[in-house]
C-alpha cells in the first residue's frame, strides 16, 4: 500500500515538473536543420513560419504550454525537444559587482557591464498622453510610460585577448538595468557567448539576450517574462 502511494506521488510530481516551463532563451536545435512553428500545439496545425538551427528564440511561461509544445516568440508553437536552452551551457563566473557594474571572467572571457543615471537632457523624448513612448526615436524597453532612472553605459568585452564591440543600438533602447540579475553562458562547441539580463519591473519588465559568436557580436533578443 505504501509503495503504491509512493509511486502515485512520484507520478504526480513528475507530471508537474514536466509541465512547468520557465520563461527563457533557447536555440533551435533540430536534426533536420530547422523547426516548424505551428499556429496551435498540434502536429496537424498550420505551419506559420520556419526557424533554422541556432536561431535564438524566447520561450514564454504561460498557459499556452501544452504537453510537449512550447509557445515561442509570442508567435506559435514548437516541439519541446527541438530546442537547446541557453542556461544549459556552461556559466561564466561572476567576479565582481557594484551598484552600477557587474563583471564576469573565465574561459578566456572577460566582461564588465556598466550602467549610469539617465539624463533626459541628453535624449530626445516623445510623449503621448503624458506617457513616454519614444526615446531617441525608438520604443523604450524596461519602462512603462515613465522616464527611466538608469540606462546602460558600456559593455567592455574581451574574448581570447581581442575586444568585442557591442554596438550602441544593441542596448540604447534598454532601460532600468538590474545589475544583480545578469548571467553569462558559454557554448564551447560553437564558441558562442550569451549575456542574459533582466531590465525594468512590473509591466515594463523585459529579458534580454546578446549573442556573441567567435568573438563577434551577432544579435540581440528580448522577451517578456510573463
Q: What residues fall within each predicted segment?
A:
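SH3/SH3-like beta-barrel superfamily modules
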Residues: 21-26, 49-82
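Short beta-strand elements that form the blades of beta-propeller/WD-repeat-like
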Residues: 110-112, 191-198
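Mature extracytoplasmic domains of secretory-pathway proteins
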Residues: 131-183
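Sec/Tat signal peptide C-region and signal peptidase I cleavage site
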Residues: 15-19
Amino acid at each position: 500500500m505504501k509503495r503504491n502511494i509512493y509511486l502515485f506521488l512520484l507520478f504526480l510530481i513528475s507530471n508537474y515538473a514536466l509541465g512547468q516551463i520557465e520563461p527563457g532563451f533557447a536555440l533551435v536545435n533540430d536534426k533536420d536543420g530547422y523547426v516548424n512553428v505551428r499556429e496551435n500545439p498540434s502536429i496537424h496545425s498550420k505551419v506559420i513560419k520556419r526557424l533554422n538551427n541556432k536561431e535564438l528564440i524566447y520561450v514564454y511561461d504561460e498557459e499556452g504550454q501544452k504537453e510537449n509544445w512550447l509557445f515561442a516568440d509570442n508567435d506559435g508553437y514548437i516541439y519541446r525537444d527541438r530546442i537547446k536552452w541557453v542556461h544549459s551551457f556552461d556559466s561564466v563566473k561572476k567576479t565582481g559587482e557594484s551598484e552600477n557594474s557587474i563583471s564576469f571572467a573565465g574561459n578566456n572571457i572577460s566582461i564588465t557591464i556598466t550602467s549610469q543615471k539617465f539624463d533626459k537632457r541628453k535624449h530626445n523624448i516623445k510623449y503621448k498622453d503624458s506617457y513616454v513612448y519614444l526615446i531617441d526615436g525608438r520604443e523604450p524597453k524596461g519602462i512603462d510610460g515613465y522616464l527611466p532612472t538608469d540606462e546602460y553605459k558600456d559593455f567592455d568585452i574581451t574574448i581570447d585577448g581581442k575586444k568585442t564591440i557591442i554596438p550602441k543600438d544593441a542596448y540604447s533602447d534598454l532601460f532600468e538595468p538590474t545589475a544583480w540579475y545578469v548571467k553569462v553562458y558559454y557554448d564551447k562547441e560553437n564558441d558562442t557567448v550569451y549575456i542574459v539580463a533582466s531590465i525594468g519591473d512590473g509591466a515594463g519588465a523585459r529579458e534580454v539576450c546578446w549573442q556573441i559568436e567567435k568573438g563577434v557580436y551577432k544579435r540581440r533578443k528580448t522577451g517578456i517574462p510573463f
